[in-house]
Structures are given as C-alpha cells and as structure tokens.
Amino acid sequence: MGDVLKAYFVPNGSYLMEMAEDGDKVSAVETLQGIGREIRDVLRPDATTMASPHWLPRSAFFVDDSAQHESFNDYPLRPAPFGRRFFSYSAAGDPVLARAIVASAREAGVPVGTKVYGLDHGAFCPLKVMDLGGIPTVPVSTSRRSFDECVRWGEAVRRAAQSAGRRVVVISPGNLTHRLDLRGDDERESYLPLGAKFDQIMIDLVTSGRSADIATIDPEMLREAAPEADGRPLYFLAGVTGHARGELLQYQGMKYSVGDATFAFEPAAAGVAR
C-alpha cells in the first residue's frame, strides 16, 4: 500500500559534502548520514521525493518526471587557493510517481506542470551525504506561491504516493535563519543573536505540530532572520504529514548566521490532521 513513510527537514549547504568527504565529526553531517542509513536499511522506500528550496518558480509548482536525474553545480565555490571542490550526483527517477503528483495537484486545483530540471545543490547535497543513490527520486519544486498553496502542494504529494502505490520518503531541505549576506572573514564563527532567538521559536512551532504557523511570528523578526524560502519547506511538510509534530534531531547556529536544524516527521494517519 502506498503512502509517505516518513518526512525530513534537512540542511542543504554545499559545505556538508566537503565535511562528509573529510570525515569531519559534525552533528549536521552525522545526522544526515544516520537518516540515510534509516532510509536505506529500515524504511526501504520505493522512492524519495525531494523538494529543493532553491527551485522557486512563481507561476506554479513543478515536477521533474524524467527517468534519470543529474546534478548541476549551482553553488559558489571557494577561491582556488582554498581548494575548490566539485561534486556530482545521479539518481534514477520515478515517472509514474511524478505523473501521479501532477494529477493529484491538478485535481486539488494546485497550479502544476512538468519540467526537466535535474538536481540543484539544495537537492543533491543532502542526497549525496545521505548516500541514497540507489533509490529513485522525484525532484519537485518549492514555489513562491502562497503559504496555503504550499500546504496543499504537500497534501497532493502524499495523495499521489497513495494513488501510485508507492512507499515514499519526502525530503524538504532548508534552514531556519538564513542570512548568508552576513558572512565575512572576521565573523566566520559568530552567530546572529536574533537568529538564535528566532530559531528557538521555529523549533517550538515545528515540534508542537505548528509548522504552518510561521507567519504568526513577528514580521520584523521574520524579515531579519530571513528563513530559507520564507519557511515554505516547512509549510510543504505540514501538508505532507498532516501537520505532524517534528522531532528535532540536531540543531546548530552555524557560522555565516545559518540556523542549521534537522527534523523528522512521522505522518499522521491518512485523513487525520490537527
């Protein structure tokens, strides 16, 4: 019987691939690797659905229904003296699941289309660190559409897993505070004080099953913290999981003022939501 087995909110910075390659003992990397083992060895899904926070069209939501997906390098490289590193990733697709997502969204009145897109680093970085190359994946966009539509988009993805008879793990990367504009050589290890406060509010919302209530946060704080994609990855997950509570697996206020958090979600029973 098809359904979403589990869902995850994970970090997606390209630095995670470097840390994993170097064997660094960093909580974000070790947690991603642990999730990868759980997906491969315990959950054993038919496919994953990956919603990159960097694929942000305005007109609609999109699905890549290709039979094969290749990564492309859209992330900034470090200056050559510090050792530039290119990474790549390939994964089989699942056109049947992809088409089911499109049909499910259309039936719900969610604007949707197909597009050959591939895997940007928001998608392939966590997939590579989790080592999920042997599992088919369906890349789907996030979107600049309304928060309500992002929730409905998540609901459509879950219904599609059910109708297609696919056992699916959904991964929606992002960061809490996301102020990369503050990076600088003199503050590489610092963290924005407001970011720590904002991140705790976000953690409290997600762990209490209120991921879709981000807009209730003070508007000025939201503007200053600038969560990745305005928090849309978490609205999407609220739809996917029936507003399930998220379990915080790790959190760190990273250098460059990034709130680096990982959550796992056990979806509510089909048809059950808060």
Regions found by a protein language model. Give the residues of each.
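A structural signal for small-residue-enriched, beta-sheet-centric alpha/beta enzyme cores
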Residues: 176-179, 184
